[in-house]
Regions:
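C-terminal edge strands of extracellular/lumenal beta-sandwich accessory domains
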Residues: 29-69, 81-85, 130-154
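Bacterial N-terminal signal peptides that target proteins for export
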Residues: 2-16
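N-terminal signal peptide c-region/cleavage motif recognized by signal peptidases
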Residues: 23-25
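Acidic, Ser/Thr/Pro-rich low-complexity intrinsically disordered segments
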Residues: 29-33, 73-144
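Intrinsically disordered, low-complexity regulatory segments
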Residues: 5, 27-28
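Polybasic/polar functional segments that serve as interface/processing modules
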Residues: 18-21
Length: 154
């Protein structure tokens, strides 16, 4: 049976695009230190993750300022988020807190619609929509590394 090479090439091209798009969505959901999934009413003390921050990747390259015009500061190990925070439903208010045993830290959070929130050791804000949030925990000073615990509260 004779197969048209141009037709085979056309189908291979479509399959390649599907593979690229699928891989992109998988990579978009990766994190250096894991994921946290939350629904309203979660138990206090259950939304905790650990990691290690610091490096030479400038967090202002993600966003210079957040939705409230606050500066986004700090340095992380790389451009991959440290954590993925998945909100199963909308939250009227959330607070993210970093305990790094005294090392000055920063937070950058990019939401599902591209909305950015920034803070220092803690970040409290309103109107958190359901979806995936990329969370970077940074060191205030370039090259400084520190272990930390990240907690989320309503």
């Amino acid at each position: 049976m004779f197969l048209n090479p141009m037709r085979q090439f056309k189908h291979a091209k479509y399959l390649a695009w599907i593979a690229v798009l699928s891989a992109t969505s998988v990579f978009a959901q990766t994190a250096n230190f894991g994921k946290i999934s939350l629904a309203p009413g979660f138990e206090p003390g259950t939304a905790i993750a650990t990691g290690s921050t610091g490096g030479y990747f400038s967090l202002p390259s993600i966003a210079n300022r957040d939705r409230h015009n606050n500066f986004c500061l700090g340095y992380s190990g790389n451009q991959t988020p440290d954590h993925i925070l998945t909100l199963e439903r909308d939250f009227p208010k959330l607070r993210l807190q970093v305990d790094s045993r005294g090392t000055p830290t920063t937070l950058v959070v990019r939401g599902p619609s591209g909305t950015v929130r920034c803070g220092n050791t803690s970040l409290e804000d309103t109107d958190w929509k359901a979806g995936n949030y990329s969370v970077w925990v940074g060191a205030k000073n370039e090259g400084v590394q520190s272990d930390y615990t990240l907690s989320v509260r309503e």
